[in-house]
Amino acid sequence: MSLEEDIVSDDEMNMIDEDDATDSEAESLSDSDTENEITEKLAEPTKTAIYNRDGLLDKLQDISWPEDVDWTHKLTVEIDQGGAVDVNDDLARETAFYTQALEGTREAFGKLNEMGVNFLRPANYYAEMVKSDVHMEKVKSRLLHEKKQIEESEERRKARDNKRMAKEVQSQKMKERAKEKKDNIESVKKWRKQRQQSGFSDKAGEPELDFESGKSFQRGGGKKRPGVSPGDRSGGKGRPTSRMGNKKREFRDSKFGHGGRKGLSKQNTAETTNDFKGGFRGGKASGNKRQKR
C-alpha cells in the first residue's frame, strides 16, 4: 500500500470521527430541547386550573397541629446537623442518617422519662397477632408441604442424574473393555505375524486362545454335569426319584420312546405289511346294523 492511500485512509477516519461527534451533539441538543419543552408545559397552567389561595390556607389550618397540642401526640424531634451534607457522597449521607436517628432517639428518650410516660414494653407483655392461630397453622402446613415437594423434586433430580451418570460410566467401561479386547487381538495377530516372518509358522504347535474362538464368552464355560438335564437349574436335586419310579420311567421309555418327532411312527413298512402272524381281529356287528355279505 502506498503513502497516498495511507493518507486518504487517515482522512476518511477523521471524517468518520467528526460525523460521530456531530451526531452525538445533535442527539444531546434534541434531548435538551425535549426537556425544555416538558418544563415549559409543566410551568404553564392548564385552562381548567383554579388557584384558590384562601381555600388552600383554610385546608392547611384544618389539617395542621394546634399550637397548644401536647408533645406526646406529635413526637417530633428536631436535630441540628451542623452543616450542609453532600448528598452525592454515600458515606457522608449515611453517616448523617445514622447520627440524626441516634440523636433523635436519645432526645425523645429523655423527654419521655422526664414526663413520666411508660413507653417501654413490659416483660410479660403479650402482643396478640392480627392473624389467628388457625390461619397461621394453615400457612405453616402449606409452607411445609411446599418444602417437602421441593425436597422430593430435588431427590428425583438427583436420582435421575445418578442414573444418567451410572449409564455413562457403564458405557465407558464397555467401550474400554471392547478397546482392550481389540488391542489384545491386534497384539496377538501382530505377534503371530512376526513369528511367521521369523520362520515359526507351524500352527499345530500354537495354543488356541479362548478369546479367538469365543469360548470365554459362553455362559457356564461349556461344562455339563452327568445326570442333569440342560434346563434343570437345581443341578439334579429338584425332584429326587425312587427306584420304582426309575423302573416305570424305563418301561414307558421302552414303550413310547424318548420323545421327538411322531409323524412317521405309525407308517407301514415292507416288513409290517407282509407280517400276518397276528391275524385279523373281526369285530362283531351290532344288532341294529345289517352284516355285509
Curated annotation (Swiss-Prot):
UniProt biased composition (Basic and acidic residues): 150-167, 173-189, 247-256
Coiled-coil stretches noted in the UniProt entry, renumbered to this chain: 135-190
GO biological process terms held by the UniProt record: ribosomal large subunit biogenesis
InterPro entries named among the record's database cross-references: Ebp2
Domain of life: Eukaryota
GO molecular function list: GTPase activity; RNA binding
Keywords attached to this entry: Coiled coil, Nucleus, Ribosome biogenesis
Bias (Acidic residues): 1-37
Biased composition (Polar residues): 265-275
Subcellular locations according to the entry: Nucleus, Nucleolus
GO cellular component, one term: nucleolus
Residue ranges, annotated region (Disordered): 1-45, 150-293
Assembly mode: Interacts with NSN1.
Entry's family note: Belongs to the EBP2 family.
Stated role: Required for the processing of the 27S pre-rRNA. Plays an important role in plant growth and senescence by modulating ribosome biogenesis in nucleolus. Associates with ribosomes.
Protein name: Probable rRNA-processing protein EBP2 homolog
Protein's organism: Arabidopsis thaliana
Gene giving rise to this polypeptide: EBP2
